[in-house]
Amino acid sequence: MANLRTQKRLAASVIGVGKRKVWLDPNETTEIANANSRSAIRKLYKNGTIVKKPETVHSRSRARALKESKRAGRHMGYGKRKGTKDARMPSQVLWMRRLRVLRKLLAKYRDAGKIDKHLYHNLYKAAKGNTFKHKRSLVEHIIAAKAEALREKALKEEAEARRVRNRAARERRQQRLAEKKEALFAEAAN
C-alpha cells in the first residue's frame, strides 16, 4: 500500500480541515498516490475520491440538564464550591445593585414631586451611608418622614393660631382696662 501522508496533508489544506477529518477512498489508492499537486487533490475531492468527514456530535443535553438542575438549586452545596463567597458573588456588585435601585427610586420620587429636593438630598446621603437595606425600607422611611412633616406643619399652624388668639385676647383685655381707667378718671373728675 502506497504512503498517502502527503496527499492527506494536501487534502486537509485544500478542504480547510484537519488531517483527521480527511477520508481517502481505500479502493482508489493508486489514483490518490499519483495526485501530487493541490489541483489534482482538488479534482479528487470534487469527484468524491477524497471526502471530508462529518463533524462528530457533542451532545449538550447533559450540560443543559445540569444547568437546569443547578437553576433549581441542586449541585450547589458546600462541597461543590471552589471560590470564596465574595469571589462567587462580589459584595461590591451586590452593593452597587442595591444602591442603584435606591437612587433610581429617589430620583423617580423627586421628579414626580412626591419628595422635595431637601428630603431627596438627605435620603440620598442616608442611602450612601447604608441606612436602608432594601427598597421597601426606604419607601416606609419616606412615608414616615412625610407624615412627620405634616404633623409638624399642623402643630406649627396650631401654635401660630394659639399665639394669634392669645395676642387678640391680651389686646382686648388691655383695651378693657384702659376703658375702665378712663371711666374711673372721668368719674373722679366729676
Curated annotation (Swiss-Prot):
Localisation per UniProt entry: Cytoplasm
GO MF assignments: RNA binding; structural constituent of ribosome
One of the protein's GO biological processes: translation
Keywords tagged on the record: Cytoplasm, Ribonucleoprotein, Ribosomal protein
Statement: the UniProt record of this protein carries the keyword Ribosomal protein: yes
Biased composition (Basic residues): 72-83
Region Disordered, residue ranges: 56-85, 166-190
Signal peptide: none
Top-level taxon: Eukaryota
Chief location of this protein within or outside the cell: cytoplasm
UniProt similarity note: Belongs to the eukaryotic ribosomal protein eL19 family.
Name of the molecule in the record: Large ribosomal subunit protein eL19
Gene: RPL19A
